[in-house]
Amino acid sequence: MDIRQVTETIAMIEEQNFDIRTITMGISLLDCIDPDINRAAEKIYQKITTKAANLVAVGDEIAAELGIPIVNKRVSVTPISLIGAATDATDYVVLAKALDKAAKEIGVDFIGGFSALVQKGYQKGDEILINSIPRALAETDKVCSSVNIGSTKSGINMTAVADMGRIIKETANLSDMGVAKLVVFANAVEDNPFMAGAFHGVGEADVIINVGVSGPGVVKRALEKVRGQSFDVVAETVKKTAFKITRIGQLVGQMASERLGVEFGIVDLSLAPTPAVGDSVARVLEEMGLETVGTHGTTAALALLNDQVKKGGVMACNQVGGLSGAFIPVSEDEGMIAAVQNGSLNLEKLEAMTAICSVGLDMIAIPEDTPAETIAAMIADEAAIGVINMKTTAVRIIPKGKEGDMIEFGGLLGTAPVMRVNGASSVDFISRGGQIPAPIHSFKN
């Protein structure tokens, strides 16, 4: 590495808000299954506190050694609906509390996996877990929840979609922060290091380390140097920058896995913003020539960014995965917040952008009087985009306040302006239930 690369890396960290967003340890809980829910809870606590005992210390050690901030240390676990199904319990709040207790004991920021996979229907534990979500999130501090309601191979479980509209409303009524820790997915991935949607897939190794990086500020600074040049130059610049960011992510992941004595999983190539000025995906898109995010051309700019991040990242790391793309959470991106406030970015444009970005309608505040069926219909729209386009999409919606209000979450979750929602009813559509079949192009065998 020559001196220029060293100075570039220092500038990325000190001036451009580069950091490792998360080191996430995935832990299988399949060996914690027990017909007695209290024994299962104890086994879960013991396994997490044993396997992840040194996660925070190792993360801090690597951050100090390399001089690179590692913002979050997290844990993801096997979907709890699979663990709870072996018991006769009628709710799984006790398992959520075991996760929360373990997370506090080891000092991690969040623990994900209070989850169910229901893309083709409910098994015994799924419905119980889904109905436990409002209380589980209200009575814990660090637990995150996700439900996968659709996939390209299975179609969309519209009964589950309707249920999740209701659950989001109930969760919002029971706690202020609960809905910020609840994600509804289509095509959820098993190795996601980011919250709130992380869970440890059943096909994964017993314990793994996954890494998520953050570098919108680095990309923006690189694009400032090629202002006015062609898209060919823009694409090459983004690709080279993504390579540098991902290289550091792989180094951190490999160091963590070696020191913790567990397998290295993947680096997630996502560009994850924060509310800090200079750490915004929206500002990257504007640097390409848009007056403001939300205007015509936004979706094309996002497509270029997303694709080149993947191309640069894949060359830098031999194991990539997770969501891998650009995140567009409204409350967590100061440029997105500004675009909503000036009227150029609305829900409909955000939905179009989700056909390309790595997640979906993320951290978006809507009026608290929005009907559950309307929320369910928003989930159905997002799921349809994901299912048809063979990509992950998700909804993390915050029904709080009234249109125009600002909802304050603090920290990385930021501030969300309450956005206008189409007032026409979707009740008859959502009340049908059943399954939207898988698309024809999913039939590959």
Swiss-Prot record:
InterPro entries from the UniProt entry: UPF0210
One family name in Pfam for this protein: DUF711
Quaternary data: Homodimer.
Family, per entry: Belongs to the UPF0210 family.
PANTHER family given in the database record: UPF0210 PROTEIN MJ1665 (PTHR37560:SF1), UPF0210 PROTEIN SPR0218 (PTHR37560)
Protein name in the entry: UPF0210 protein SPG_0223
Organism phylogeny: Bacteria, Bacillati, Bacillota, Bacilli, Lactobacillales
